[in-house]
Design a protein with these regions (language model features):
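RNA/tRNA-interacting regions in translation and RNA-turnover enzymes
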Residues: 1-440
Length: 440
């Protein structure tokens, strides 16, 4: 029963995450469910069926773009969450290679969307999303708008595929979300979802405004290219004028790999892009070929996932702000707490239903984390720490700015001011009108 429950839940979450770009749980919660399913199936191999999420390379594909079959599948990576699991990976690799010397290249895992760029005679001709790993979506027109992707490279190869990650820099992400809040639109949960949503725009002009970027890190199908290692590949990609993440390092033993990974524990918050882990790859392509792949993942690489950083704090009050369409939005005013490199004093509570669902009260001790390491959110309240002084929050029945009644329409989660002449709403509209994205 648990097996079927996990499969159904993971399928549902994968659809929300990959196809809709609207995740409903954190990456860590998803990873833990996936791992539980893997463990059950390892213990009972005869229970494994072809439609299990563990047998799928990636995700279903949304409509709207033409499909394209990759020359060589874009595999996903196996995940580990602890130092000991990295050591186990190292031991497996060394055993499979008969104990011969090896090197690892360790790279930051950029939190974006994997894409495949196809060049013929040096000309960029097609950009394709990873999709389910076998078939992706043709997003060529949108990829062309990304300035860190060269439209021509110094190669006369008849066909070469460059793979990497399209991502949204944190400054672009914060500016985009501020604009979405100003427009009363739901902000993106994290830069990865913002990048994915931007690449799937039917109008490339919108994509161009989103200021996306690209890090190259792999080859797909290619001809006439002789490269012998991951380190050599990264150097060649840089010579092709691709942006290559400069933070990679090469090591000969796993303990140095682990030390390098943990050197990022206190530094990754200062990076100008989001990262959710580190990727460890066997450097030699000859050794990679000998180690091979499973149906789903390479045996020569592994992704170490950073645990989400959380903090406890107190809800001092719940305040309500008014947007230019008259929507009332609640937010938690918090005891200042340090989290992921910044001091957090406020976290969005979205709407009345969110507060009720999480049972968040004024005076509660709550756990907060940054969604996708960026936006502060209340994960849960800790009712066991209540002392009886906490207060249940109720949305105001009148507008905090003008005193007019507020209403909640059928099928909506938002409360709105009913006064078309509300001074706060008019002020917000004027502020928007003179903003960079409107009159200016």
């Amino acid at each position: 029963a648990r097996l079927l429950e996990l499969r159904k839940k993971i399928d549902e979450l994968s659809y929300q995450y990959y196809t809709l770009d609207k995740p409903t749980v954190t990456d860590y919660e998803y990873d833990m469910m996936y791992r539980e399913l893997e463990n059950i199936e390892k213990a009972h191999p005869d229970w494994v069926t072809p439609d299990s999420p563990t047998q799928r390379v990636g995700s279903k594909i949304s409509g709207g773009f033409e499909k394209y079959t990759h020359d060589r599948p874009m595999l996903s990576l196996g995940d580990v969450f602890s130092d000991d699991e990295l050591r186990e990976f190292d031991q497996r690799v060394r055993d499979d290679l008969g104990g011969e010397d090896l090197e690892y290249v360790v790279e930051l895992k950029i939190d974006g969307l994997a894409v495949n760029l196809i060049y013929e005679q040096g000309q960029f001709i097609r950009g394709v999303t990873r999709g389910d790993g076998v078939v992706g979506e043709d997003i060529t027109n949108n990829v062309r708008t990304i300035r860190t992707i060269p439209l021509h490279i110094a190669s006369d190869s008849p066909h070469i595929e460059i793979r990497g990650e399209v991502y949204m820099p944190i400054t672009s992400f914060e500016a985009l979300n501020q604009q979405r809040r100003d427009d009363e639109l739901e902000p993106f949960a994290n830069p990865r979802n913002a990048a994915a949503g931007s690449l799937r725009q039917l109008d490339p002009r919108i994509t161009a405004q989103r200021k996306l970027a690209f890090f190259a890190y792999a080859l797909g199908g290619n001809s006439g290219i002789t490269i012998e290692s991951q380190e050599e590949l990264l150097q060649a990609l840089a010579q092709f004028h691709f942006q290559v993440n400069p933070e990679y390092r090469k090591f000969t033993n796993i303990e140095d790999v682990i030390a390098f990974i943990h050197s990022w524990d206190d530094r990754r918050d200062s990076l100008p892009y989001a990262t959710d882990g580190m990727v460890v790859k066997v450097n030699s392509f000859a050794q990679q070929a000998r180690l091979g792949n499973t149906v789903k993942i390479p045996r020569w690489a592994i992704a170490y996932k950073f645990p989400p950083e959380q903090a406890r704090t107190k809800v001092l009050d719940i305040s309500v702000s008014l947007g230019r369409t008259g929507v009332l939005t609640p937010a938690a005013d918090l005891e200042p707490v340090h989290l992921a490199g910044t001091t957090v004093k406020r976290a969005t509570l979205h709407n009345e239903d969110y507060i009720k669902e999480k049972d968040i009260r004024i005076g509660d001790t709550v756990v907060i984390q940054k969604a996708g390491e960026i936006i502060p959110e209340v994960v849960r309240s800790l009712p066991e720490l209540r002392d009886g002084s906490e207060k249940v929050f109720a949305m105001p029945t009148t507008c905090p700015a003008c005193g007019s009644p507020v209403v909640r329409r059928d099928g909506e989660a938002a409360w709105r001011c009913t006064n078309p002449d509300c001074p706060a709403v008019i002020g917000e509209k004027i502020a928007h009108f003179v903003s960079r994205d409107a009159m200016n």
